[in-house]
């Protein structure tokens, strides 16, 4: 989802500005194989997730007009399973 949002933003901005992804998936999620008996330890890491708490900045853009950035980030936000908000700093 992070990568899908990043791709959508860069495709929308084209060669305008620069995009930064401010989150990184650093928590492994382990899964056991289907129909495995109980016991014998923990399953293997299947994929990685990023835990996002409220107030965390997900993406950052620079060198782009505000209306283009707002449109690009709203497209990226539609790919996220959480409620997001567009903020302007500086």
Curated annotation (Swiss-Prot):
Any single GO molecular-function term of the entry would be: structural constituent of ribosome
Record's subcellular location = Plastid, Chloroplast
Query: Its GO CC terms?
Result: chloroplast; mitochondrial large ribosomal subunit
Keywords of the record: Chloroplast, Plastid, Ribonucleoprotein, Ribosomal protein
Q: Name one Pfam family in it.
A: Ribosomal_L16
Superkingdom: Eukaryota
Per the UniProt entry, what is one GO biological process?
Answer: mitochondrial translation
For whether the record's keyword set contains Cell cycle, the answer is no
Q: Which family does it belong to?
A: Belongs to the universal ribosomal protein uL16 family.
Q: How does it assemble?
A: Part of the 50S ribosomal subunit.
Report the protein name in the record: Large ribosomal subunit protein uL16c
Q: What is the species listed in this Swiss-Prot or TrEMBL entry?
A: Oenothera ammophila
